[in-house]
């Protein structure tokens, strides 16, 4: 990883204001695929066919309905992102085991290991090549499965992080093998400068892309028995893309019109945003189908896996990356929201906790954690500053997720050093757990 998460907004392509809505009648968008009704809306849907007279009669003849069943309160997480770069963690079994033991001892409840980066995986996959350094060092290590076993027996959860989402390096084999999967700009270009590399973006609307992406996720869930999966700001559709032959034809088929030349046309944006949401709905359903089947040799279904999302700020995500994470959250397409807040000063951090989307998210009945920079490169806050930030977040009922592992007490721990910071994190987590209903 070239820089801290949350700097995705610093792009070569500027964000320009949205175009005003056209006056001409707009195409009717195709409906999303029909799936099982979502829990929050199933009761309402069941009432819609009932005639008005029946409803009025029932209102006077039946007792008041019981209030809607509320989900049990979910306790805040104390988690950390783990990556391979820059860190030797994934390549050494003894180091990996010790890291998990130290994290458990220090009060962590959830681990978010990077499992998909730069077109390669950190597990044996039939959909993509293994990360070259891991394949060279120890192709049989399978660090995600090993980490999961070690963490779960210590009472922690493991939620692998699919960091690169739908991005691929421009030179990846899949790009040359399946050029029809790649999104294009209106001028036909595909290159997307990102993290100092030339990347391309695979098409969320293409059936082949969808099957491969969901397959990457399901094989980790099935093989390693993880507790969920995480998507982030790379699970997106960049707003200037979508003029490739496949997307043009799909838009014509569904709307009877050509894609507008203006990539900021709001109805064109809405249609593409809908395609991305459709992919997430399909992933949600496939995970539910998997979890509903009995475990091998067992009689009971598996528990439902968590879909965690760590997006950028809402307005930027909605307009630039076509991510509607408010809809995804309210519609139960995601279960856990981690809002990145990497402001270096305590004052800036506190201000960002008051952003409207974050305040609104607290009312959605789902856990909302705050991503906090523990240390990366030359940016390592001292423990006093970190403590202030953590207590600000947990004081408002949020959990905290640190970026990243080596910034806790490892390579990027700063001048305070490893042993002192590890002891300080242990004390801090004991302190915040004593002030919360609990943690998970």
Question: Where are these predicted regions, by residue range?
Answer:
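Catalytic domains of carbohydrate-active enzymes, especially glycoside hydrolases
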Residues: 95-120, 224, 396-399
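Aromatic- and acidic-residue-enriched segments that line the glycan-binding/catalytic groove
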Residues: 124-135, 166-195, 233-260
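Glycoside hydrolase catalytic-domain groove-lining segments
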Residues: 251-294, 298-379
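The substrate-binding groove and active-site-proximal loops of carbohydrate-active enzymes
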Residues: 82-90, 127-140, 196-211, 265-275, ...
